Amino acid sequence: MPDTQELPPAEADGGREGDRGVVDRLRAGDEGAFVALLDRHSPAMLRLASCHLPHASAEEVVQETWLAVLKGIRRFEGRSSLKTWIFSILTNRTKTRAQREGRTLPFSALVNPSEEAAEPSVDPTRFLPADHPQWPHHWATPPKSWGESPEERLLTRESQARIQQAIDALPHGQRQVITLCDVEEWEPEEVCSVLGVTRTNQRVILHRARSKVRRALEQYFEDA
């Protein structure tokens, strides 16, 4: 096998042109290409699977997903990006495992627009408009920058931990959406494709998730 330790940038970014190169290398048995792909996506896969499963089960599902990728790569037709295809396999296996363990409902059952609308909302003026050229739907007033003193750096680390705690406390559906949108920085279309939700529902769920995380962070600073 070729001794390839990493993917070229275009391929690592998951574009369609790069996808073809990666798929060809995987089909040819390029171990280096597979390891690079595994290193690139496994952390995000584990975070997503952990939205529904305990850590040990999530790790097993990630391993099962990679085995399925290797077995199914010759059947990959390129109708979606390679990344979307991999994460769709992960999502399906996560749902199956979670249902088998009696831990949760399918994602579609968790996304209830009427229940989302009934939740306490944050003033819409606190968000940038949908047509904002750079940061649509993001907070209009971001948190102020922290300084460089040891105390301020400690506060930054503590606040990051508090943000993760707030994300971990979200309902499964909201946790998945905010993880993919804000932690992994996926495009909305990719999130909708992998999770099987509409663009409208994705926006609603993300808004609710961000609102809860923001409230938790504001409470943290009030108490700090």
Q: What spans do the regions from the language model cover?
A:
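Short, Lys/Arg-enriched C-terminal cap helix and immediately downstream tail that follows
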Residues: P2-E6, Q99-G102, L170-R175, R210-A224
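Sigma70-family region 2
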Residues: R27-A28, C51-H55, E64-S81, T96, ...
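Residue-level preference for hydrophobic side chains embedded in well-ordered alpha helices
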Residues: L37, H41, M45, T65, ...
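Amphipathic, Lys/Arg- and hydrophobic-enriched alpha-helical face
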Residues: L38-A56, K71-G72, I167, G173, ...
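Helix-turn-helix DNA-binding module
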Residues: E152-R153, R157, A161-Q176, L180, ...
